[in-house]
From Swiss-Prot:
Record organism: Clostridium perfringens (strain 13 / Type A)
Record field: transmembrane: none
Function: This protein is located at the 30S-50S ribosomal subunit interface and may play a role in the structure and function of the aminoacyl-tRNA binding site.
HAMAP family (UniProt xref): Ribosomal_bL19 (MF_00402)
Any one GO BP annotation for this protein: translation
UniProt-recorded name of the protein: Large ribosomal subunit protein bL19
InterPro entries named among the record's database cross-references: Ribosomal_bL19 (IPR001857), Ribosomal_bL19_CS (IPR018257), Ribosomal_bL19_sf (IPR038657), Translation_prot_SH3-like_sf (IPR008991)
Annotated keywords: Ribonucleoprotein, Ribosomal protein
Keyword Methyltransferase appears in the UniProt entry: no
Length: 115
């Protein structure tokens, strides 16, 4: 049974999206349907969490807009995600960056990864 589920999930996983890690600043292009028309909205922020794996994988992006912290969780394989752009790579030593919620201003920045 487990092999059957894995085989079905493998078919539905999207391969066209850019790979990113925790700490990266990304732009998520999301399709939004309003009435009978569809448009693309861009949500830019820092990836603070990646969860699960395979078809059920999700990630959370955090940004501060007008002094208010906004977090949005997206399923990676959702059809509403048009594309993901990596703005900059971050250098972090944690898998979950929940400590950024308590920080304000420059303290909430993630160091940039230099290669």
């Amino acid at each position: 049974m487990n092999e059957i589920i894995r085989a079905i999930e493998k078919e539905q996983i999207r391969e066209d999206l850019t790979q990113f890690n925790i700490g990266d600043t990304i732009k998520v292009h999301v399709r939004i349907k309003e009435g009978n028309r569809e448009r693309i909205q861009v949500f830019e922020g820092t990836v603070i969490k990646k969860q699960n794996g395979g078809l059920r994988e999700t990630f959370t992006v955090r940004r501060v807009a007008y002094g208010v912290g906004v977090e949005r969780t997206f399923p990676i394989n959702a059809p509403i995600i048009d594309k993901i752009d990596v703005v900059r790579r971050g250098k972090v030593r944690r898998a979950k960056l929940f400590y950024l919620r308590d920080r304000v201003g420059k303290a909430a920045k993630v160091k940039e990864l230099t290669r």
